[in-house]
């Protein structure tokens, strides 16, 4: 099982947080059937835009200590069988990069990081392309850098 706790991508102050309740095991009708050869086992990953809009989500706005970042938003997206998103930080709390923000309760998941316009973010894919064969990036390893 993958790690289902959320860690802050930046140091800063929690400005606002809330849960958006959504679907459970929602899929689009054509999901997984784009391939002319057979159903696609990667379909849940390929349809993350849909899942991000319909699934249960936890939203945390953080005013980063780094002025190059400013206000940013972390969105935890519960995929497939996630039963809930638990936010453990509080509004007004100062957090450090790597501190736990919350946790998914049972099941699959993904995350979204939103930055304001003009923030130059360079992602580190650790020498791999996103696919079913890619490996998890270790907790606290760099996933992106603000330039």
Could you say what each language-model-derived stretch is?
Residues 1-147:
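Contiguous, well-folded functional domains in the mature portion of proteins
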